[in-house]
């Protein structure tokens, strides 16, 4: 069913799935969305999910979105202010393998950043995770989106910026292409300092 005014809505869908976070903290209220606590199993199931959504034809009819990049698994009540501390060993052995597989094997079209910070930096403006790893090492060419209202968290909860304008600039400068929320809207793109 589609109303006449809605005939152009939902063309070229992006499904914000799969959730390939590693379920390590039972206080996280979204563990049921994941494939569990095993990085290898999560990567295998995630790759097949993306292939199923995106297909293997010449035209992508729907796009998958790997979420929530990258060290996100609770606790739920602190997700907007939490700073996940992860060693490089833990990051590369636990949290990043599924994302790497979805990008390098399944060519996932989109990646969604998490609400939380990882080692002090918001995941939706994390230079190392977004530039060095995702777009650099893995050669990701799709679009990066924030989780809903995650950019607002920069100035309201993480306190890494003071204003929505600073938060938008921080996210855009780091390569966050799409903001699920309204932080980008009141800002004139011509006033931002972009590289």
Region annotations inferred by a language model:
Residues 1-192:
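Glycoside hydrolase catalytic-domain context in secreted enzymes
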